[in-house]
Amino acid sequence: QIGLRGETVDAFSDDLPLYDRLFLGGSKSIRGVDFREIAPRIYAHENKKGRYVAWGGQTSWCMNMEYSVPVVKMLRVAVFSDLGSVGEDDFDFDTAWFCWSVGLGLRLDLEQFPIRLDFATPVVDPDESVDEKVFTFSVGYDF
């Protein structure tokens, strides 16, 4: 299976609210990173300590590739690769926040109730200080 998705949003004012901004990461986009982790960041102060937090962007694209092999009637083993990026402005296809992950998964095909268990790790991660492996559990169809 191959899935490709692209989005862009624009605002009538100078600022786009946080709830309308775009992020990638998690079981429905890039499975090798945590939910909403891939996005442009801003520096936030909290309790006299500062850190960078994901602020979101206005353009995103994501590509998911997956190949699965049946083991028994209701169980498949999958190998997958996810990649994508989030741009800060509308129609901004900058690759500064590009991420690519690979992983393995199990697919349990129950009638009307498919279950996905995935284990993935980033190959290219814009936040290189994070060395993580992510396990995701989801119910529903692939991307």
Residue ranges, per PLM feature:
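Membrane-embedded beta-strand positions in outer-membrane beta-barrel channels/transporters
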Residues: 1-3, 62-64, 101-105, 136-138
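Residues that define the transmembrane beta-barrel architecture of outer-membrane proteins
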Residues: 27, 57-61, 96-102, 131-135
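Outer-membrane beta-barrel "beta-signal"
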Residues: 104-115, 132-143
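Membrane-spanning beta-strand positions in outer-membrane beta-barrel proteins
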Residues: 1, 76, 114-116
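C-terminal outer-membrane beta-barrel translocator/porin domains of Gram-negative envelope proteins
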Residues: 1-71, 79-83, 87-89
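Strand-loop-strand
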Residues: 89, 95-104, 108-110
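Outer-membrane beta-barrel channels and translocator barrels
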Residues: 9, 70-74, 109-113
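Outer-membrane beta-barrel translocator/channel fold
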Residues: 7-24, 115, 121-134
